[in-house]
């Protein structure tokens, strides 16, 4: 574990790097990003925290376009966790308006780029305006066949796994599933990412080295890349750098 932690630290970045030459045949198909550091970015500039969230929303546009250019198949973004409800009410209210604003501005472009919008998380406890906006985006883009833009909104991985196990238990109770037939694949099929491949690469900004209850099951064999760069300062070059590092690694999935 200590050896791996050292490797993670060794792959952290705190500056923008020149464009890397990538192997187009080895682009990760699913990239997941924990977009962290908006509040710290704002604090460093003497601005309110919501200014950092507003700036961070602009970065999403750039990264989505770069993901399309790189032919990434799935981009999962951790937008709002189940723990984020503990933040100040004014900040929570602002955060939950951002999906509506983003989709209002970007939905025409996402349609033009053949992007399919998905949401994983508890929509039923979101404000009505937020739930309506994301539901509309999912409905309008459901037949698109390009990049899957998967927002984790009101999402927590432990909650996701508990709900999955409840569904499995119910199937066992009703006799539609034998307890002996419960496998990793069965559990995976009951997660919110049931029809998505697991992430190949996880990126986390802001220098924090933890998963923060994000896709704990799905990230079991993902490659991790951490950067000190705060999310509002994250650029297409950082995404390319992360992928370049990913391409140098040997994914053994527990083997030799």
Swiss-Prot record:
Sequence positions that bind Mg(2+): 36, 223
GO molecular function, one term: ditrans,polycis-undecaprenyl-diphosphate synthase [(2E,6E)-farnesyl-diphosphate specific] activity
PROSITE patterns attached to this UniProt entry: UPP_SYNTHASE
UniProt KW DNA repair keyword: no
Cross-referenced Pfam families: Prenyltransf
Cofactor binding note of this UniProt entry: Binds 2 magnesium ions per subunit.
Enzyme class, first EC level, given as a word: transferase
Cofactors demanded by this protein: Mg(2+)
Domain of life: Bacteria
SUPFAM superfamilies: Undecaprenyl diphosphate synthase
UniProt-listed InterPro entries: UPP_synth-like (IPR001441), UPP_synth-like_CS (IPR018520), UPP_synth-like_sf (IPR036424)
Active site: 36, 84
Record GO cellular component, one term: cytosol
EC identifiers of the protein: 2.5.1.-
Keywords: Magnesium, Metal-binding, Transferase
Gene Ontology annotations of biological process type: polyprenol biosynthetic process
Record: residues binding substrate: 37-41, 49, 53, 81-83, 85, 87, 204, 210-212
Function: Catalyzes the condensation of isopentenyl diphosphate (IPP) with allylic pyrophosphates generating different type of terpenoids.
NCBIfam families in alphabetical order: PRK14830.1, uppS
Self-association state and partner proteins as the record states: Homodimer.
Family under the similarity heading: Belongs to the UPP synthase family.
Protein name according to UniProt: Isoprenyl transferase
């Amino acid at each position: 574990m200590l050896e791996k932690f050292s490797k993670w630290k060794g792959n952290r970045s705190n500056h923008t790097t020149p464009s890397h030459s990538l192997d187009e045949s080895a682009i990760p198909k699913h990239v997941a990003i924990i977009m962290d550091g908006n509040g710290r970015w704002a604090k460093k500039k003497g601005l309110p925290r919501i200014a950092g969230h507003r700036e961070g929303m602009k970065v999403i546009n750039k990264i989505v376009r770069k993901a399309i250019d790189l032919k990434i198949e799935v981009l999962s973004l951790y937008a709002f966790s189940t723990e984020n409800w503990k933040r100040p009410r004014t900040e929570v209210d602002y955060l939950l308006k951002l999906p509506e604003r983003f989709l209002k501005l970007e939905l025409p472009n996402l349609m033009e780029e053949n992007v399919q919008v998905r949401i994983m998380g508890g929509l039923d406890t979101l404000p009505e305006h937020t739930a309506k906006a994301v539901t509309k985006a999912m409905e309008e883009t459901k037949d698109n066949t390009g990049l899957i833009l998967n927002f984790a909104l009101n999402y927590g991985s432990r909650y996701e796994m508990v709900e999955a196990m409840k569904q499995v238990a119910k199937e066992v109770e009703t006799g539609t599933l034998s307890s002996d037939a419960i496998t990793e694949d069965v559990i995976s099929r009951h997660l919110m990412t049931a029809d998505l491949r697991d992430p190949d690469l996880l990126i986390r900004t802001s220098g924090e080295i933890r998963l923060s209850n994000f896709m704990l099951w799905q990230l079991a064999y993902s490659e991790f890349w951490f950067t000190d760069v705060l999310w509002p300062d994250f650029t297409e070059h950082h995404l390319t750098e992360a992928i370049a590092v990913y391409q140098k690694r040997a994914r053994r999935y527990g083997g030799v």
